[in-house]
C-alpha cells in the first residue's frame, strides 16, 4: 500500500510540474511587417481580386468543357 501511495505522489508531482511549466514565449512580430500592414490595410483585398479575376474565368471554362463532354 505504501508503494502505491509513493507512486501516486510521484505521478502527481510530475503531472503538476508539467502543467505549470512555463511555456516558451512567442516570438515578437517583426516591426516591418506591422508597419506594412498598417500602411496598406487593403493589400489583401487586391490579392483576392487578382485571384478571382484570373481564376474564375478558368473555372467557368473548365465547367463548360466538362458539361459538353458528358
Swiss-Prot record:
Pfam family membership, one: Melittin
Organ and tissue specificity: Expressed by the venom gland.
Record's keyword terms, sorted: Allergen, Amidation, Antimicrobial, Cytolysis, Formylation, Hemolysis, Ion transport, Membrane, Pharmaceutical, Porin, Secreted, Signal, Target cell membrane, Target membrane, Toxin, Transmembrane, Transport
Propeptide stretch(es), residue numbers: 22-43
Subcellular location: Secreted; Target cell membrane
Family: Belongs to the melittin family.
Identification of the protein by name: Melittin
Gene field: MELT
